[in-house]
Amino acid sequence: MNINGASVVVTGGASGLGAATARRLTAEGAKVVILDLPTSPGAQVAADLGATFVGADVTDPDTVNAALDAAENLAPLRALVHCAGRGGAVRLVDRDGNPGSLEAYEGVVRTNLIGTFNVLRLAAARMAKNDDVDGERGVCVLTASVAAYEGQIGQIPYASAKAGIVGMTLVAARDLASKHIRVTTIAPGLFDTPILARLPENVRDSLAQSIPHPSRLGVPEEYASLALHIISNPMLNGETIRLDGAIRMAPR
């Protein structure tokens, strides 16, 4: 898929993996719409890149559709890179012997899994109306995590939501094959994002040393590079690609 002159929506594009992806896609000639929370720095990031910002919640159809409208006003929507998500720790039984919070679990799953389904279905419906170009109408890149495979203690809402995205990928690719829309997922390992930046330096160093090779945190530009490759390679479809330096997460 050639995205030069096409529109692309990047969710979670105000920071981290999403911001790096928006930057890379803009450099490739795409007309990028950044979808992120209204409270995020997305407007400034978009202004710096010459992109468009739409404040939205990925679980809200109306605001997601507003971002998709903004993209289609620029050019046909040919790609989605869905990076938006959140963390949140829940233990099945807490230190006092109480059951883990159902509300906290639902909140993480709603953003990470329901939000992914919502954005994917709405974007795919737009792409399905595109003209077919070289056998394709659109590409959707989703974001899971290595936690889908090796979730750590306390990560049960995050891990199960990300595992849901992994499970969604092949089914979605098969579902959309007749529409000539591809769906592929990236499962990042430990990346140098704003979430990890809040950790003490010694903790960050320890995390980096746990990665076999290269023994460092991933950088968002490496995620962006893979996202662009997925978009441009027509045989990448229905697969979840680990981007993790061969790490396998320990229980804690």
Regions found by a protein language model. Give the residues of each.
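Short, small/polar-rich loop/turn modules that mediate ligand/substrate recognition or access, typified
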Residues: A177, R182, L236-E239
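Active-site helix of classical SDR
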Residues: L120, A161, T169
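Residue(s) in the substrate-gating loop at a strand-loop-helix junction
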Residues: S145
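C-terminal substrate-recognition "lid" of short-chain dehydrogenase/reductases
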Residues: V219-L243, R248
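Catalytic Tyr-X3-Lys loop
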Residues: R86, N98-N118, V141, I165
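Catalytic Tyr-x(3-8)-Lys segment
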Residues: R110, N202-E222
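Conserved mid-core segment of classical short-chain dehydrogenase/reductases
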Residues: R86-E106, A125, K129-D134, G154-P157, ...
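Alpha-helical segment proximal to the catalytic Tyr-Lys
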Residues: A125, A173-D175
